[in-house]
Amino acid sequence: MPNRDMLFSVPIANLGDWTFDERVADVFPDMIQRSVPGYSNIISMIGMLAERFARSNSLVYDLGCSLGAATLSMRRNIHVPDCKIIAVDNSPAMVKRCRGHIDAFRSETPVEVIEADILNIDIKNASMVVLNFTLQFLEPSQRQVLIERIYQGLNPGGVLVLSEKFNFADKDVGELLFNMHLDFKRANGYSELEISQKRSMLENVMLTDSVETHKARLADAGFEHSEIWFQCFNFGSLLAVKAEEKA
């Protein structure tokens, strides 16, 4: 059983901004299951996408890998030879635990876990790239740059999987889905204090975009095909496919 997230169950005088530190890493599996609707579905389906898109003699990237859930899902479903997964996170606590999770399972598909800023990673020869609830933590000015670098590093026919929390131009819809997400967290045992304190810590470091903004950014980078393939309330995932080279 994962350690239960009780980090915000008592009042904290000086909340500060959110960091993925040792305390968060220790309860992260429980936290994300109870906080992100559809998370386990997205993880399992990322594995299905890897089975379809991963190619031999190519690289697969998990950028912002946290504890390696998406990496493990992909590795279980990659059945082609000479395909390597590169998992990257800038949190030492996350990377340490991720390496332990990866090493606990045997596989023919090698995984390299790197502690680094994903903006400094050279993306090349990629058949698949995953940004699973990662882009929203980057400075908005850096997001287009990263998406363009991913596009350039993808091989023709390669896929980017982009999972995010969304905001909405339609304020009525946005408010409804926001409140449904609050109900989801309450149903999973979070108190009003826990919800409020976590939101206060995240509000300066997690800046969300609309689906339309994501699609425009993908198109500007060169992706000809992009669409939402999963959504639950104000959380979801898009895929963007780099066009095959024309004969």
UniProtKB/Swiss-Prot annotation:
Keywords: S-adenosyl-L-methionine, Transferase. GO terms for biological process: tRNA wobble uridine modification. PANTHER family: CARBOXY-S-ADENOSYL-L-METHIONINE SYNTHASE (PTHR43861:SF2), TRANS-ACONITATE 2-METHYLTRANSFERASE-RELATED (PTHR43861). GO terms for molecular function: carboxyl- or carbamoyltransferase activity; S-adenosyl-L-methionine binding. It is an enzyme of class 2 (transferase). Homodimer. Signal peptide: none annotated. Catalyzes the conversion of S-adenosyl-L-methionine (SAM) to carboxy-S-adenosyl-L-methionine (Cx-SAM). InterPro entries: CmoA, Methyltransf_25, SAM-dependent_MTases_sf. It comes from the Bacteria. This is Carboxy-S-adenosyl-L-methionine synthase.
